[in-house]
Amino acid sequence: MTHICIIFPKCLIFKMRKFYLMKLCFARLLFGLLPFLLAQSLRAQFLQSDSDDRLKQWVEYLASDALEGRLTGSQGEKMAFDFLSEKFQEWTLSPAQGDKFTQAFEFTWEILPSPEATIEWEANGDRTALNAYPISGCGEALMPGTEFLNLGFGIEDTANGHSDYPSVSDLGGKVVLIEAGSPKSDNPHADFSRWTLLERARLAAQRGAGAVLFYGGTSDDSPSKTIDPHIHAMPIPVWYCLDALPQSNEPALIWINSSLNRIKKTGHNVVADLIRNKNLPTLIVGAHYDHLGWGERGSLYRGEKAIHNGADDNASGTALMLELARFLAQTKDKRFLRFNYRFIGFSGEELGLLGSKAFVEGPAFQREGLLTMFNMDMVGRLDLQEKTLQIHGAGTSPRWATLLDSLKPIGLKIKTSESGIGPSDHTSFYLQDLPVLHFFSGTHDDYHKPSDDPHTLNYRGMTDIGNYMLRIIAHVPDVLPFSKTKAPEQGKSKFKVTLGVVPDYGWEKKGMRISGVTEGKPAALAGLQKNDVVLQLGDHPVDDIYGYMAALGKFKKGDQTTVRILREENSLTFKITFE
């Protein structure tokens, strides 16, 4: 074997050593920069600073006085859905159905006494109209010249040692007069607070009363003149008399015309599709655009009547939905081309998730092919110091936890909760077994008040939230398994027991319809299902959501009873054990 000896000049050896040292330094520098480069990738901005300006412009319009609070069914709602439709049209999105982006749904706004409705007192052949009005739970009936019975406070409460029904088994269709206040008791621990007027009227109806007329009590005892459409009407009239009842030594009769008018209104969801390929999964991005109008319902403001502009709740989420729609419609980034998108502006959220509920029950909703639903509700108040974003629904898919944590932006704190059930529109989709995420920047003192105005919002924070959402979309897998979650903790409940169901708050027929059933809870263990209508718990009739809550209050943990439900057209009874 021949050995060859090569001698390098000293200058070449020096250059080779210098090159090696430079390469080693570069490698060490690159390794040291990896965390920084990773951080920079997490700061990747899909939305730029001009997004702040667009978000501000859109919020200032949606939350302007001109739209008068965007109350569902109002002219302000129309101005808002016209605005959303114009934007979707501008970005060449397609209506989900037909040739319009709007999808209408009808709801009961209020119930009013008809012009003929009255209660009259007859004595000595003369009839005098009483200063009275129908209250929540009132049914319709015509009752000419009916005998009446004074039933005290109309309470039967053996635990507190009080009963106004000791010798009355059947009220025989009489008009029952009930004092609106509470009885005095020698027992210092006696509590009659659960005996609302509605509860007393239900008891009287069960005992055979033909009508209930409340009277007296303090000003605090006077019920609202607004008839709650969510309270199912009893089969009997229920009225309240403002003045003292007439006194007569002669026999008297009561005449009742309890005729009511249900005032219907129409709300509108705004639905737009971005279809790339019909075979791709669809990701839903939604936000409710309605608010409280002039504070007719749900306001926490106690001053003079004023417009509730709802900048954070929820012009912020609506504007961010629009910005995501604009970006996704225009992007060429392949990571976003893996999905079809459906953008939905919901109305009726403030009245009980009416719009999202109508949508998932309507023909435009097909569960097959849907990947997930992102909901933005109140995303405009990201705190400048804390920078904490709340994300609800993190337990609705086993993939969410890792994804949300790994993509968390630098400097942004993420607080997650697992439940897919909450007071916003994602709940309607979770109840259809769809993974959901609800993005929420937190509550504040301006919530449901006229002071929730555009100047209070953090528009840079909204853009940051939008970029985080886009990072999630860019990395979300094409297949996303669904997980059921436990109901959220609501703090200490006034009920001793739970059935483990989600009530349908928009149900207007008799009974309490179930929107969802929590696994492992009494209802699920007994065999109850979504869309079952609860009609009776034990001996207690359930006419509506309030009757359901009243019935729950009669039980304690460990009690066994029966629950009677209506499933489609079949009446079924199940045995149940409360926990």
Across the structure, where does each feature detected by a protein language model lie?
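Soluble metallo-hydrolase cores and metallopeptidase-like ectodomains found primarily
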Residues: 47, 126-168, 228-310, 326, ...
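N-terminal capping segment at the start of a domain
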Residues: 49-75, 91, 95-101, 219-231, ...
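Conserved PDZ fold ligand-binding element
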Residues: 525-545
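PDZ/PDZ-like peptide-tail recognition elements
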Residues: 480-519, 524, 554, 562-564, ...
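Catalytic-core environment of secreted peptidases
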Residues: 47-67, 72-95, 120, 169-170, ...
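Metal-dependent peptidase/peptidase-like ectodomains
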Residues: 141-142, 238, 346-441, 458-460
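His/Asp/Glu-rich mid-to-C-terminal helical/loop segments that flank catalytic regions of hydrolases
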Residues: 319, 326-327, 445-490
